[in-house]
Design a protein with these regions (language model features):
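Alpha-helical transmembrane segments and their helix-start/interface "positive-inside/aromatic belt" motifs
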Residues: 9-13, 116-131, 199-212, 285-298
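Predominantly late transmembrane helices and immediately cytosolic-facing juxtamembrane segments
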Residues: 110, 187-251, 267-282, 360-364
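Short, membrane-exposed interhelical loops at transmembrane-helix boundaries
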Residues: 245-250, 316-336
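Juxtamembrane interface elements at the cytosolic ends of transmembrane helices
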Residues: 27-35, 98-112, 138-153, 174-196, ...
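Membrane-interface helix-loop-helix modules in multi-pass inner-membrane proteins
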Residues: 56-130, 141-148, 232-236, 258-259
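Membrane-interface transmembrane-helix boundary segments in multi-pass integral membrane proteins
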Residues: 203-205, 209, 255-265, 327-345
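Membrane-interfacial helix termini and the short, flexible loops that connect transmembrane helices
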Residues: 36-49, 74-80, 101-121, 188-200, ...
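N-terminal signal-anchor module of multipass membrane proteins
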Residues: 1-59, 65-69
Length: 378
């Protein structure tokens, strides 16, 4: 049905969609978890916050699991190289993700302030660490990752965990955290009442403005970073072999795609305008629009990074010609074809049941809801 080149492009788009879906849905879960000990001033308020995400958090995590599975199947070399290079960071992320269901399930089992406060901080950790690590990972991808391939296409990573925590990557990590917290705050503005609602509204406005500032700073910063350019001819229909190309480093090269394809400027414009609209909507008590604009903010930032790097997926700072691109590090044509058929069925199913759950379980929560469901609620 599709040729090899088209399948490669389709899966670049699909993985991008899965990452955006994760940021939009699991983003507000993590944002709420990060905010729970910050703006929840009483046990009841914190329970209200957690129960706004109770019907959705496990379903939202499907986006991340699916993205990981798609990365493994569609880009196996990228999967292997990234997990070996970001090994400690990946385990820190998984530890935080494992901690979240434990904290949600065990927090309300014992009516002891110290017990519940401990789990509140565990939830904050589970909502803060993953977005920072994801942002740091994207920041390092834009700078290049120190790996190389041998003749058997086996990757070897030459960096350290602390080398990943460079200034630009940390800026990207804080930006990701602000976007997720804004997502959580706008969600709470839609779902809560009274003082908790007001605090969430204030947080949404503050984090939105910080996100705009960080994104603009990052945009100017990336223009001074050495980007990657393919200088040889690459056969987009050939079997995957990252060693069959030449790549050079050029300062400001990540801006080339925006100059070549002006339509791509839509993404960074979204990354600046949508947080501003989210702040305005939040200020004027339009919670639904604030959440929508916050979601589009996440999409705009992710798309900006993807468009800037295209067709690179994982550049190598150690040996630029060993960089992994969407044209030479994918699975076979047969595998991509079979996966496309599966995705054509499963992605609409995921979208369908996700939409249905939000529709059926929409509404604001208040103290009365927690009191009436004291045993069953988180």
């Amino acid at each position: 049905m599709f040729d090899y080149e088209s399948l490669r492009l389709i899966w670049w788009v699909l993985i991008g969609v899965l990452l955006v879906g994760f940021a939009v849905t699991d983003g507000f879960d993590m944002g709420v978890a990060a905010l729970s000990p910050v703006i929840g001033k009483s046990d009841t308020e914190r329970r209200i916050m957690l129960n706004t995400i109770a019907p959705h958090w496990d379903g939202n995590q499907v986006w991340l699991i699916t993205a990981g599975g798609a990365l493994f199947a569609a880009w196996p070399l990228v999967y292997a190289t990234s997990f070996s290079g970001f090994y400690f960071a990946m385990y820190a992320t998984l530890a935080a993700l494992w901690l979240r269901p434990l904290a949600l399930d065990y927090r309300s089992k014992i009516e002891d302030p110290k017990w519940r406060k401990t789990w509140d901080y565990a939830l904050c950790f589970s909502g803060t660490v993953p977005p920072i690590i994801f942002g740091v990972a994207f920041g390092n991808l834009l700078q290049g990752v120190p790996f190389e391939l041998n003749e058997f296409m086996m990757s070897k990573y030459h960096g350290t965990f602390f080398a990943l925590l460079n200034p630009f990557a940390l800026l990207c990590g804080v930006l990701a955290l602000m976007l997720f917290v804004m997502q959580g705050a706008t969600w709470l503005q839609m779902k809560t009442t009274e003082e908790l609602h007001s605090r969430a509204r204030n947080v949404a406005q503050i984090t939105g403005l910080i996100a705009i500032a960080l994104f603009i700073i990052g945009g100017f910063w990336v223009q001074s970073i050495e980007g990657y350019v393919i200088t040889s001819t690459i056969d987009t229909f050939a079997d995957s072999n990252p060693l069959n190309k030449e790549v050079s480093l050029q300062v400001g090269a990540w801006m080339t795609n925006f100059e070549t394809y002006p339509a791509m400027w839509t993404a960074p414009i979204l990354g600046v305008v949508m947080p501003l609209l989210a702040v305005i909507a939040s200020r004027f008590e339009r919670g639904g629009f604030a959440f929508l604009f916050s979601s589009l903010s996440n999409a705009g930032v992710i798309l900006t990074a993807g468009f800037a790097m295209f067709p690179f997926v994982m550049p190598s700072s150690l040996n630029p010609s060993h960089s992994l691109t969407m044209w030479d590090s994918t699975a076979s044509e047969l595998t991509l074809g079979l996966m496309t058929g599966v995705a054509a069925v499963m992605v609409p199913v995921i979208l369908g049941y996700t939409t249905w759950t939000y529709y059926k379980m929409f509404g604001r929560l208040d103290k009365k809801h927690i009191e009436d469901n004291d045993v069953s609620a988180y």
